[in-house]
Design a protein with these regions (language model features):
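Peripheral, non-AAA+ core regions of ATP-driven protein-machinery
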Residues: 1-213, 218-225, 324, 460-463, ...
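Basic, amphipathic alpha-helical bundle interface domains used for macromolecular binding and assembly
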Residues: 34, 40-45, 60, 67-77, ...
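Alpha-helical scaffold elements adjacent to nucleotide-binding pockets in ATP/GTP-utilizing enzyme cores
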Residues: 47, 51, 84-87, 122-126, ...
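Short loop/turn elements that form and flank the Walker-type P-loop nucleotide-binding site
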Residues: 59-62, 98-99, 131, 208-210, ...
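Catalytic P-loop NTPase motifs of RecA-like helicase/translocase cores
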Residues: 111, 298-305, 348
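Conserved alpha-helical scaffold flanking the Walker A/P-loop in AAA+ ATPase domains
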Residues: 204-206, 257-263, 268-296, 328
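Walker A/P-loop
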Residues: 213-254, 318
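Walker B catalytic acidic pair
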Residues: 293, 299-301, 311
Length: 486
């Protein structure tokens, strides 16, 4: 007799639903698993036999063949233990268990208990895509709280409990533990910002339009504090976006707590290019992937190696990075927002006080950052000490709601394709001609102007919006090298 059940396996952050077929027939007792199982899957045979015994369930006598579909995909890990056991129970019809489309994900212990697994966030997106609506896990399994609304949840303590619930067709929707819910970002501590009204407006523009930013200034001027506070302005992710983020975060941190807040990654300047990009035999995500849909914060950007910074070119352009995993090219998501800080020179005081650096040293210092990376940064802003003492203007918290509204407006109007008025077109054309702007400069100025208009609640981009955008990204004067040595 044939029985089947649905399980799942994970490859990196991707999940594949597996259809487990079991055939129990006459013949010499033998338990075979086919369908490209690795050693961890094959070891399930011993765990399943013992789990049946301790659950008080008769283990079928005769020839047992288990097939894992699709057979062409290599199966690894212990996620399939419970699905294999349920398929065997259904094939043996002792006890009789109805077939359904529930996905079973748990490891079996020798005493029949269900062992929770790490990294299940990706299952939600895969099950939804394939039209599956019921999930069975351990009672101790931590799951993202959106699962409670997305699926019928069946939680069981052991194999005997699974059998009881399936025979009674009871699918219990149980709330995930409250510890999985992260408090809104507005309740978190935000470093106090004294003054900085110009910089706060700039941060709001960057947050609303996902513009990249490099802040240059002397030590102690506040650029790092501003960079740290930037994430406070970002709106929450959607549930689908948060599940996608969690799928990758759980690879690096199995104890990752699900949250709607965008991730913020702050790698040390000694990190290698491999550490930024990820890859390797096990498909480990790098910092650019862990910052997907969030912020990659590079404090003291010029202390990073030239090779590490140059590695950012592809993910900044494509929003993804192609890595080699087990000899196969694999695309990792890397749509991050770069926020960086830097000193103007090795001593840190060029243009801000008594600088002891020779011009040649300053030029050599800035050559640590590849020109193409600087060109891809939307705004290079110099933070002055005088600016840091200015008072007035909206507070950081006051900008949060404006950024949220501007982000929604940009999304509803297809973002950067908002209409420029005739006057705005003329201002943009004349400025770009006068300043010999490149096509990239022109595109970035138009995008900045669109964001500025959205912050004011406007669909149409007006001339003043373009004029402000030109101030933030002035073609021909963005080079920190030029500004630092003059």
């Amino acid at each position: 007799m044939l029985g089947y059940a649905f399980g799942a396996i994970r490859h990196g952050a991707d999940v594949q639903i597996v259809r487990v077929q079991a055939d129990v027939g006459p013949g010499f007792p033998r338990f075979t698993i086919v369908g490209l199982p690795d050693s961890s899957v094959s070891e399930a045979k011993a765990r399943i036999r013992s789990a049946f015994h301790h659950a008080g369930l008769p283990f079928p006598k005769g020839r047992i063949t288990v097939n894992l579909q699709p057979a062409s995909l290599k199966k690894q890990g212990s996620w399939l233990d419970l699905a294999i056991a349920v398929a065997i129970l259904r094939a043996s019809a002792s006890p009789s268990i109805p077939h359904d489309s529930t996905v079973f994900v748990a490891e079996l212990s020798l005493d029949g208990g269900l062992v929770p697994q790490s990294g299940l966030s990706a299952i939600g997106l895969r099950m939804r895509d394939e039209g599956l609506s019921s999930l069975c896990v351990s009672t101790d399994q931590r799951l993202p709280w959106p699962f409670d609304n997305m699926f019928h949840m069946m939680r069981a303590a052991d194999l005997a409990d699974v059998v009881t619930q399936l025979r009674q067709s009871q699918v219990h929707a149980v709330r995930s533990p409250a510890r999985n819910v992260t408090l809104p970002e507005t309740t978190r501590f935000v470093p106090p910002l004294n003054g900085h009204p110009v910089e706060l407006r700039l941060l709001a523009i960057c947050a609303a339009g996902r513009h990249t930013l490099l802040m240059v200034g002397s030590p102690g001027v506040g650029k790092t504090t501003l960079a740290d506070a930037f994430a406070h302005l970002l709106p929450d992710l959607t549930e689908d976006e948060a599940l996608e983020v969690a799928a990758w975060q759980e690879i690096a941190n199995p104890d990752y707590a699900f949250t709607l807040r965008p991730p913020v990654r702050r790698p040390h300047h000694a990190i290698s290019a491999r550490g930024l990009l990820g890859g390797g035999r096990w498909g480990t995500p790098g910092e650019v992937t862990l910052a997907h849909r969030g912020v990659l914060l590079l404090d003291e950007m010029l202390e990073f190696s030239h090779a590490s910074l140059n590695a950012l070119r592809e993910p900044m352009d494509r929003g993804a990075i192609e890595c080699t995993v087990n000899g196969k090219p694999t695309l990792f998501p890397a749509s991050f927002q770069l926020i960086a800080t830097a000193n103007p020179c090795p001593c840190g005081y060029r243009g801000y006080g008594d600088c002891s650096c020779h011009d040649l040293d300053v030029r050599r210092y800035w050559t640590r950052c590849p020109g193409p990376i600087l060109d891809r940064i939307d705004i290079v802003h110099h933070v002055n000490r005088d600016t840091g003492r200015e008072q007035g203007g909206a507070s950081l918290d006051a900008w949060v709601e404006r950024v949220r509204e501007a982000t929604a407006l940009l999304a509803s109007s297809s973002g950067r394709t908002s209409t420029l008025s005739d006057d705005a077109h003329r201002v943009l054309r004349r400025a770009c001609d006068r300043l010999r702007a490149s096509e990239r400069d022109r595109e970035k100025i138009a995008a900045l102007a669109t964001t500025i208009a959205a912050l004011e609640g406007r669909d149409e981009v007006l001339a003043p919006h373009v004029e402000e955008a030109i101030v933030w990204r002035r073609p021909g004067s963005l080079s920190p090298v030029r500004n630092a040595i003059t």
